[in-house]
Each structure stands twice: as C-alpha cells, then as structure tokens.
C-alpha cells in the first residue's frame, strides 16, 4: 500500500466545521473595512527575493532565518511572501497608484515563515492587512487604530485586548539613539545572550525586543528611545495620543516596542492579549514613510497594520463562545417517492431565484423520510420543505419548522412567501 502523503508541518488544513467560523469572522472584518471606505487589493503569493530583503531588512529574523526562498527554472531567486506590506508597496509603485494620490487598501491571504510551529504560530498563516498611502498626519494613524477597535467590539473581544503604543522617531533620531544604546550594551556585554551580542552592532534596536528575562532586566537601565525623539515625531505622537483619548480608546505607552521589521518610523502599535498564552500579539503595525522611496518609488507617507487571523479566530473562540458560525443550511428539501427528485430539484431552483441569499440544500442519494430529516438536522437546517408523490401530483409542498415541529401544506407557488415569514 502506498504511503499516505500528509500536509507539511506547520501548514494546516481548515475543514468545513472550522471554515464556517472563519467566514463569519472575515465577513465581520470586511464589513467594517467597507464602512471606512477601504478597497481590496489582491497580491501574488510569490515575489522576487530582493523585495523582502530591501523592505524588511537583511539583518532581521524574517530574512535571515524564516523566509521560504527558492530558485526558479530561470535562475531567479523567489520567496513565498512572509508579510504583505512589501508586496502592496511594490504593486502600488508598479501600477502608479501612489504618487500624489491617496489610497486606503486592504488584503487578505496566506503568508509563510519557517518558524517552530505552535498554537497560534504556523509556517503558513493568514493575515488581513491594511495600508494607507499619501497621508502623513496622526489622524490617519488614529483612524486605523479606531478601525481595529471597532473590529474588537463587533467580535465581542474588546475586554480581552489592550493597545500598546510607541514612537520610534525619524531615521536621524534612531541613529542617535542607536549610538547611545550600543554604548550601553557594550558596557554590559557579558549579560547579553549570543543573539543579542550579534544584533548589538547589526541591528541594536532589535535587542529591545529580546524575550530573554535577563536582557529585559538589563534594559530597565538602558537609554530610553523617547529621550532621543525629534520634535516632529514628538508632536506627531502627542497628536495621536490626544485623538485616541478623544475617541475613548485606552492605550499604554511601551518604550520597548520597536516592531520586528526595519521599515517602520514614528508610530508603532500592537494589540495584545493575555488569553492566548505566549502568542500575545493579535494585530500590529505602524508608520513607514520611507519604504516607498526605498523600493524605487517617489517619497510617499504610509501607515498600516497586519492581523493574524489564526490568532484572532482562537481568541474569539476562547473568550466569546456566543459568536458562532452562520448555519451552513437554512432550508433542507426532502423528497421521497417515484419521480419526486426532478420536481424537488426544479422547486429548489425556483426558491433560490425567489429567496436571494437563503442557503437551500436538496437531498440527494435517496433515503426514507426519517433519514432525510436526520440529514437536515445534521446540516443545521431551520426549515424542511417536503415533497412526496401526493404533493407533486397536487402542486403543493409541506413546510416544516424543524425547531417547533409545526408543519403546513402550501401551494408550491406560495412556498417562497411562507419561507420568508418563517425565516424572518
């Protein structure tokens, strides 16, 4: 017997029982995006490798350790996208969407990173990202955060996520801070782990993001990034905080929040939770005003975020069990007896025409009434429409409310109207 081929480690199948809740959550997210006037953009899963090296930074965990990179038959180096911002910027430049224009975009789809799989962290994972181009004030930063807060309210998880904010300033401000941080780390080199020693010179701000408790304790005495901010970044951050306070959105300033990708400047933020163990970040983003120019476009202000959908689904299921998937089936059409199947299928098509958006499943594969009603129950149907030989002859159907058990014989021309009343 041939050996079964299984899914790659860390790349999961999502079965019908799971995708139903995903679809409801995604529908909620998309409705909110539409209410803010954001437009969807669809991007390739594979991009040229230099795109990510230039955008994310060569001395980052993503580029050094986590990217799925391969050479195609033409000898070009290609990479499965580890995040969505770089591809979105590339598309904006390539198609002339950015210069002297305002764009508010969102995308959704799989990303790929070669990490150690664990709950909430996978090698293929799904993100929903938003990117705004052409606006540089703190008001658009605030709008993105307000948009995410509206998501949490719609999903019933507001009490289980908290907002952390920081400003990492301009490129010049970070360069000054970098020198001060390196000088401090050199004085305490013996307390650093090997990863931090390596990063101390290649990308010292990443040391601030270390998960090592000893390094975190050491950093309590390190220079504070906030003390090195340029005046424009201070004003921008103060404006953002004021707007969030006016909107009633609570936040904590976390001066060690720097984000894992090199392209950020000024505003950075994360929504975090204590309800998912070690995988606490649900949504994160910030401003990246230099990235468009860095990737070959004209200087364009930009801000955005990405949200991990696997973690969001886990969080909703953990803290809001009342948020359930929409039923797969509203109406189940039962047919039994000689020559009833073609009549049942014809009636089903008429009902689909007249009841837009209603989910109707026709029984196939035969079976007596008892078996067919069991199937209707399995699919979660609220109503059954029943056709037997006498109903076909008389041009009627029996409509049965599967919750109350009440049933009514109705002329086939009136079935749609009767179902509208039953389904509300």
Curated annotation (Swiss-Prot):
Reactions that this protein is recorded to catalyse: tRNA(His) + L-histidine + ATP = L-histidyl-tRNA(His) + AMP + diphosphate + H(+)
Keywords: Aminoacyl-tRNA synthetase, ATP-binding, Cytoplasm, Ligase, Nucleotide-binding, Protein biosynthesis
GO molecular function terms listed in the Swiss-Prot or TrEMBL record: ATP binding; histidine-tRNA ligase activity
Pfam families, A to Z: HGTP_anticodon, tRNA-synt_His
Gene Ontology CC entries for this record: cytoplasm
Subcellular localization(s) per the UniProt record: Cytoplasm
InterPro entries attached to this UniProt entry: aa-tRNA-synth_II (IPR006195), aa-tRNA-synth_II/BPL/LPL (IPR045864), Anticodon-bd (IPR004154), Anticodon-bd_dom_sf (IPR036621), His-tRNA-ligase (IPR015807), HisRS-like_core (IPR041715), HisRS/HisZ (IPR004516), HisRS_anticodon (IPR033656)
EC number, as in UniProt: 6.1.1.21
GO BP, sorted A to Z: histidyl-tRNA aminoacylation
Oligomeric and partner information: Homodimer.
PANTHER family: HISTIDINE--TRNA LIGASE, MITOCHONDRIAL-RELATED, HISTIDYL-TRNA SYNTHETASE
Family to which this protein belongs: Belongs to the class-II aminoacyl-tRNA synthetase family.
HAMAP family documented for this protein: His_tRNA_synth
Protein name stated in the entry: Histidine--tRNA ligase
Record organism: Shigella boydii serotype 18 (strain CDC 3083-94 / BS512)
Gene: hisS
């Amino acid at each position: 017997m041939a050996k079964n081929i299984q899914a790659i480690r860390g790349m999961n199948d999502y079965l019908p029982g799971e995708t139903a809740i995903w679809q409801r959550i995604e529908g909620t997210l998309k409705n909110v995006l539409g209410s803010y006037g954001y437009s969807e953009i669809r991007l390739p899963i594979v991009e040229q490798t230099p795109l990510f090296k230039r955008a994310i930074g060569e001395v980052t965990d993503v580029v050094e350790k986590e990217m799925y990179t391969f050479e195609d038959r033409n000898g070009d180096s290609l990479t499965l996208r580890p995040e969505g911002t770089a591809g979105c910027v590339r598309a904006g430049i390539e198609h002339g969407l950015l210069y002297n224009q305002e764009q508010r975009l969102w995308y959704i789809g799989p990303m790929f990173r070669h990490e150690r799989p664990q709950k909430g962290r996978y090698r293929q994972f799904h993100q929903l990202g938003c990117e705004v181009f052409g606006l540089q004030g703190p008001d658009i930063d605030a709008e993105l955060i307000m948009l995410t807060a509206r998501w949490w309210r719609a999903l019933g998880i507001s009490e289980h996520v908290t907002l952390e904010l920081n400003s990492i300033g301009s490129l010049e401000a970070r360069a000054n801070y970098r020198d001060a941080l390196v000088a401090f780390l050199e004085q305490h080199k013996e307390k650093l782990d090997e990863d931090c020693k390596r990063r101390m010179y290649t990308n010292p701000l990443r040391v601030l993001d270390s998960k090592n408790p000893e390094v975190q304790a050491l950093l309590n005495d390190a220079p504070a990034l906030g003390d090195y901010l340029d005046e424009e970044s201070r004003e921008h951050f103060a404006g953002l905080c004021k707007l969030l306070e006016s909107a009633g959105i609570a936040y904590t300033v976390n001066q060690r929040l720097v984000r894992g990708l090199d392209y950020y400047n000024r505003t950075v933020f994360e929504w975090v939770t204590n309800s998912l163990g070690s995988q606490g970040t649900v949504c994160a983003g910030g401003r990246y005003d230099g990235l468009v120019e860095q990737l070959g476009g004209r200087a364009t202000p930009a801000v955005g975020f990405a949200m991990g959908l696997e973690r969001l689904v886990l969080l909703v299921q953990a803290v809001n069990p009342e948020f359930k998937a929409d039923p797969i089936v509203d109406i189940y059409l039962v047919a039994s007896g000689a020559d009833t199947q073609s009549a049942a299928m014809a009636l089903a098509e008429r009902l689909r025409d007249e009841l837009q958006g209603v989910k109707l499943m026709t029984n196939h594969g035969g079976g007596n009434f008892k078996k067919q009603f069991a199937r209707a129950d399995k699919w979660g149907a609220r109503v059954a429409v029943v056709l037997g030989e006498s109903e076909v002859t008389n041009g009627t159907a029996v409509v049965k409310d599967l919750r109350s058990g009440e049933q009514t014989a109705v002329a086939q021309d009136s079935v749609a109207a009767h179902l509208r009343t039953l389904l509300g």
